[in-house]
Amino acid sequence: MTTSKKWMSVSIAAVMSVAIAQSASAQDRVLKVTNWGEYIGEETIENFENEFGIEVIYDVYDSAESIDAKLLAGNSGYDVVVHASGDAARLIKAGIIAPLDTSKLDNLKHIDPAIMEQLASEWDPGNQHMVPYMWGTHGVTYNNELVLETYPDAPVGSMDMIFDPNHMKELAKCGVSFLDSPGDIIPMALAHLGLDPNSTNPEDYEKVGAMLAEIRPYVKTFDNYAYQRMPQREFCVATTWGPDGLLAMSGAVEADTGVVLDFYLPSGEGTAQLWVDSWMIPADAENKEDAHLFLNYMMRPEVAAGDSNFTWYATANRDAKPFIDVEVTSSPAAFPTSDQVEKMYTTVVLPPRVERLQTRTWTNFKAGN
């Protein structure tokens, strides 16, 4: 509107050419974003587009390995990516993630300092590459009635329920699903055996491989979204990320099928993993300017709260908590207690030889070797 007032005296043709140029410029503002499926508020992207006049091409992926492969191959085509901070740490070392211009991210002030410190100490020295998004842990989501109906002696609350072949053999009758995520399951298995979740000892991976081989015949599927089908009694047990367990419980209530789901964390010191997912900008991103604008927008407390209310994941945004539904903030599945967090472990970047060991262990597990 201001432009047309300034140039009221020019010819109609000139005004039209300016309008066309402005329209083309607006259309040129395209931001390409990728994230896990169902991991953002329902209106978050639309509201960003409406406010800033930027078209967002939003893509989803279903495994950390798939986005890793795209980023490592180069020319991913993305301007903004959500990734597990532990996995992304090695991408940073490889120069695949761009440093952030924090002068354009004034909303970093809303992020929990404890989480920023966690990132700096474990994965992103100096907090130069990552904007924390969500955090949480993993555990077991289960249909208690179906479990006990199938196997009255099931050790509910113990990780033996999923790692002991004697128990798994019985529970296979009502369906057991594992996360399709070696970065979660392999450290979980190491911890269950009382070993270092970040072990670099080949013998430890042999022990894990042997344990997983014994339970493999009883794993129905490897699926990060199996929790969505638990209200239909397709599975009685599933390893899930904590908030997905909460979503499963809510889904069961909404489905009104009479199914009641519960969730538990691995108990004991160093047996549950603390993870943080972060926003980051690939080094080959074409639109870094608007990528920073998007990250700053995502850190608004009300936006972060909307994302948590939809996904039921714990936001890293400290100032968003007053806007988040109590149903979410009061659940240990979504927001583990401080006592639980203190006992959790974090994963670190492993040497390439150990990464290959982990990959081989996982591949053999899924293949039943």
For every predicted segment, state its role.
Residues 1-11:
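Bacterial N-terminal signal peptides that target proteins for export
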Residues 20-26:
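Sec/Tat signal peptide C-region and signal peptidase I cleavage site
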Residues 27-91:
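Early extracytoplasmic/lumenal segment of secretory-pathway proteins
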Residues 54, 74-81, 96-98, 169-174, ...:
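Alpha-to-beta junction loops
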Residues 88-217, 225-229:
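Extracytoplasmic ligand-binding site segments that recognize negatively charged/polar headgroups
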Residues 220-284, 322-333:
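Extracytoplasmic/periplasmic substrate-binding proteins
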Residues 277, 282-343:
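Mature extracytoplasmic/periplasmic domains
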Residues 338-369:
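Conserved C-terminal helix/tail region of periplasmic/extracytoplasmic solute-binding proteins
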